Amino acid sequence: MVDVIALGEPLIQFNSFNPGPLRFVNYFEKHVAGSELNFCIAVVRNHLSCSLIARVGNDEFGKNIIEYSRAQGIDTSHIKVDNESFTGIYFIQRGYPIPMKSELVYYRKGSAGSRLSPEDINENYVRNSRLVHSTGITLAISDNAKEAVIKAFELAKSRSLDTNIRPKLWSSLEKAKETILSILKKYDIEVLITDPDDTKILLDVTDPDEAYRKYKELGVKVLLYKLGSKGAIAYKDNVKAFKDAYKVPVEDPTGAGDAMAGTFVSLYLQGKDIEYSLAHGIAASTLVITVRGDNELTPTLEDAERFLNEFKT
């Protein structure tokens, strides 16, 4: 039995070596990434097993993703190699036009990952897991990928969802709102991961306490409310925990939220309280933003403990 299953599209990332407009960048670093893959790595590094249900192309990038994922301890037995399409890629423009922020340019339309479908879901495998995770990204990339998430959520004992609304992937923000709210209304979500921007789209509020009240009315049990450079708040049973962000040099913030989410969810599943899980999630996201690459610095449980005990800002 696997502890956690994530559904989504793994991607190859080309991260600009220097900040600035992509038209002036000559050198890039290649990384394996993708929101759900990043989430899985955080889960594994906190001592739970995790499987990624996905598709990659029958190409060198697809092989790279499978080999890298396996090396990180992810169960890759449910990553399907699709002979009809290609592995998606994206480029990161760092520090321009907003310092310490990154912009993503995707080349993924029609990719193998977007061809994820309900037929890729092994029903018994999903039923026997403890929790199924996905994101608004997977809900956005294609109708069949959305249906795969719905099928997995139907079978799941427990669910977590990261709203992760990427406007470039949706036909409209209204469509994003309609789709994600339909999921929240239909399924009990054990842990919802979101932020003020997404909550403004979904509920037309940004205040964390008001957001928790409204999400709770929709059946959300635990809310992880990310505040970027201001830290994050977690809620459960009307108990609220806040953890401020650490001040560190920001190389690339991409992937920080995935590291926080995977760390928080995995520790919560192990019976840790929201304060402990949140502190470790903040530690993970802090380390990730200091380098290029989404998941290489996602810490193990032990390294996060050391960070929390020794690092002061």
UniProtKB/Swiss-Prot annotation:
pH profile:
Optimum pH is between 7 and 8.
Does the keyword RNA-binding belong to this entry? no
Ordered alphabetically, the record's keywords are: ATP-binding, Carbohydrate metabolism, Kinase, Nucleotide-binding, Transferase
* An individual GO BP term: phosphorylation
Source domain of life is: Archaea
Q: Identify the catalytic residues.
A: 258
Record-listed ATP binding positions: 164-166, 226-231, 255-258
Which is a Pfam family this sequence falls into?
A: PfkB
Its pathway?
Answer: Carbohydrate acid metabolism; 2-dehydro-3-deoxy-D-gluconate degradation; D-glyceraldehyde 3-phosphate and pyruvate from 2-dehydro-3-deoxy-D-gluconate: step 1/2
- Give the catalytic activity: 2-dehydro-3-deoxy-D-gluconate + ATP = 2-dehydro-3-deoxy-6-phospho-D-gluconate + ADP + H(+); 2-dehydro-3-deoxy-D-galactonate + ATP = 2-dehydro-3-deoxy-6-phospho-D-galactonate + ADP + H(+)
Q: Keyword Transmembrane helix on this protein?
A: no
UniProt binding sites for substrate: 34-38, 90, 106-108, 166, 258, 294
| EC numbers for this chain | 2.7.1.178
InterPro entries cross-referenced by the UniProt entry = KDG_KDGal_kin, PfkB_Carbo_kinase, PfkB_dom, Ribokinase-like
The free-text temperature note is: Optimum temperature is between 70 and 80 degrees Celsius.
Q: Name one GO molecular function term.
A: 2-dehydro-3-deoxygluconokinase activity
Q: Which family does it belong to?
A: Belongs to the carbohydrate kinase PfkB family.
Q: How does it assemble?
A: Homohexamer; trimer of dimers.
Q: Which PANTHER family match?
A: HEXOKINASE FAMILY MEMBER, PSEUDOURIDINE KINASE-RELATED
Main role?
Involved in the degradation of glucose and galactose via the semi-phosphorylative Entner-Doudoroff pathway. Catalyzes the phosphorylation of 2-keto-3-deoxygluconate (KDG) and 2-keto-3-deoxygalactonate (KDGal) to produce 2-keto-3-deoxy-6-phosphogluconate (KDPG) and 2-keto-3-deoxy-6-phosphogalactonate (KDPGal), respectively.
* NCBIfam families referenced in this protein's UniProt entry, alphabetically: KDG_KDGal_kin
Name of the molecule in the record: 2-dehydro-3-deoxygluconokinase/2-dehydro-3-deoxygalactonokinase
The gene is kdgK
